[in-house]
Amino acid sequence: KTGQKDAFVVAVDVKQIAQQVAKEKANDPMFIAAMAALDKGQIDPVTEQLLLGTINKQIPTSTTVVPLNRPINVSSRDPQKATIMPKTLKTLTVENAEQVHPVAGTKYQTYAASSRLLYADGSVQTPLYANAAFVLKPGKPVLYVGITTDVQRDYFKPIFDNAFKSIK
């Protein structure tokens, strides 16, 4: 904590999550190739460009509102009861999203991206800044996500950037 600004960082074991999510794809050649790259901790330059191109096409280039909870449609004879609406609509607005890019000067291949966010929960809005880094540590790839209320990026952005570069 810095008084007015708060931040937290979470680390996600990418290999473990990939294995749990894709159990049914364990024999898929693309999954096997992806897991081999995660084990090796390296992606060749051609694959890197293909991956970055594919990922960056999915990143919003303009302000985008993402609903976090949507109405649920259920089967019902009464059309009035066919949709269950959430009590408050929660959204995440993505602004100034940065493209995923390689980070120079790191021990392991590292890729980073960041964005300003606006979390809205009914009448309450919380501006945030998120900075993420994917570190391809051999055998133990990790996704680090830092989130802060420092939306001006004066205090925590340099801290996040230096932390992601110094991962050993």
Pin down the residues of each PLM region.
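N-terminal "mature-domain start" segment
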Residues: 1-19, 23-32, 89
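Phenylalanine-focused residue identity feature
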Residues: 8, 31, 108-111, 134, ...
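Residue-level detector of solvent-exposed, low-hydrophobicity positions
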Residues: 15, 38, 115-118, 136, ...
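Short linear sequence motifs
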Residues: 24, 101-104, 127, 137, ...
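Short, low-complexity, polar/charged sequence segments that are solvent-exposed and flexible
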Residues: 28-33, 83-86, 162-166
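Surface-exposed amphipathic alpha-helical segments
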Residues: 138-168
